[in-house]
Amino acid sequence: MRVTEYIPGQPCWSELATHDWQGAKRFYHALFGWDMADMALPGSAFSMFTLDGDDLGAIYQVPDVAVDNLKTQWGIYFATDNVDTTIARVLEAGGTLVMGPHDIGHAGRMAQLADPEGARFAVWECKRHIGAKRRHEPGALCWVELASRSPARAHQFYCEVFGWDCRESSNSEMRYCEWLVSGEAHGGMLEMTAEWGEMPPHWMLYFQVLDCDEHAARVEALGGRVCVPPTDIPGVGRFAVLNDPDGGIFSVIALRGS
């Protein structure tokens, strides 16, 4: 559906940092049908990815000076009405400031942050650009999910920073929390067990599709990898965790009844 504004705390933008900008553009265009609008930015190659002319997110080339420090990865932005106030809340709650704050021309103001476990996220204060103009439809972001080793600590942190409510889900055998903004679920949180190995806490982005299995097969055909094969979530839909050719991890989900 089309979006004209975001409530503070809602996911509002997704962004891929990649070491293969051209390859990423080809891969995601073939996978989701996204069109790419290249933009000139000092020191980096940058593209907006769009659906029928509506901005959904961005893909950018990791600068050479950051090659050793930044892996190919998807990042999520949450809306805020004041970036600087949000930074202060993050620091007070035990998080860290990773980068910024920066004004992005007349579009808005942003900062990259990390929670107490190191899971990174960004915040966006809209001026002229609200963020993604579509959500909850095929090809668009529909869900974000925090994998945490300390759910109680994460719960306290994000509720203090964004004012989210948390609802325990009854649709899973494992403990699962749904994050609520003004009563609407926009994401979730699960606990990382020993089976996760040394993987650090992180945010996972889910893009909606009509056919999970078809997209998983397409990822492999395009040179990517299936990390978690298509799996049913009772009462919700069918999802898969995927890896693009440069190592960017993301998920797709075909929602029940969609």
Where are the model-predicted features located?
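Vicinal oxygen chelate
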Residues: 1-7, 91-142, 167-184, 191-194, ...
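Long compositionally biased, domain-poor regions of proteins
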Residues: 30, 160-161, 185-191, 195, ...
